[in-house]
Amino acid sequence: IVFHESKSLTREVITKNTKPEPNGFYGNSKLQAENGLHKLDDEQFRVVILRPPMIYGPNSKGNFMRLIKLARITPVFPAYHNKRSMLYIDNLCEFIKQIIIREKSGVFYPQNNELADTVEIVKYFAKAYNHKIFMWKWLNIFVHIGSLFLNSINKMFATYYYDPNMSIYPFEYIVCSQEKSFEYVLNNNEDK
């Protein structure tokens, strides 16, 4: 479920009290499906709704891989720091395993222990690929201007994360730290 469509670079923290605001037919249909599934939950049939943030791993599709590619080729990057919730695929798999073992039901918000920062991700992969990149604050004005016209800029630079307390459960599911997961992605990507 998309809680809402980010149209600005304002800081957004999702809490357990945040009401879903689907941004279109797809998001609305997912919310309706969730509401219908909740009605089926009982002792014989457990319903689990997972609302993970961006999931990443080796050879994953989407924005994370685009960010890695950018880190390999761009000579400059805005020093525009943010916070983002992310979830490594192995951590998601462990979370699902623990939910099944414990026969849990409900709505869950798993995420890595660490919040990600777009600038730090780009720095990490640029260094790993031995690529010189300059991070300049004066480029931040272009982030602000671009965010008015391009949703992709908002997706890359907006601060948007789950309250870390939402992701604490009575079982361990973080099998790989964020830094180790980046290392694993680096060493196991087909596009090296």
Feature map (PLM): residue ranges:
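Flexible, glycine-rich beta-alpha linker
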Residues: 3-4, 48-66
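Short, flexible, mixed-charge acidic loops at enzyme active sites
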Residues: 6-13, 64, 68, 154, ...
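Catalytic helix-loop patch of NAD(P)-dependent Rossmann-fold dehydrogenases
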Residues: 8-49, 54-55, 76
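Conserved donor sugar-nucleotide recognition element shared by glycan-biosynthetic enzymes
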Residues: 29-30, 60-64, 85, 118
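A conserved pocket-lining segment of Rossmann-fold NAD(P)-dependent short-chain dehydrogenase/reductase
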Residues: 69-87, 91, 95-98
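Mid/C-terminal beta-alpha module of Rossmann-like enzyme folds, strongest
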Residues: 95-153, 182-192
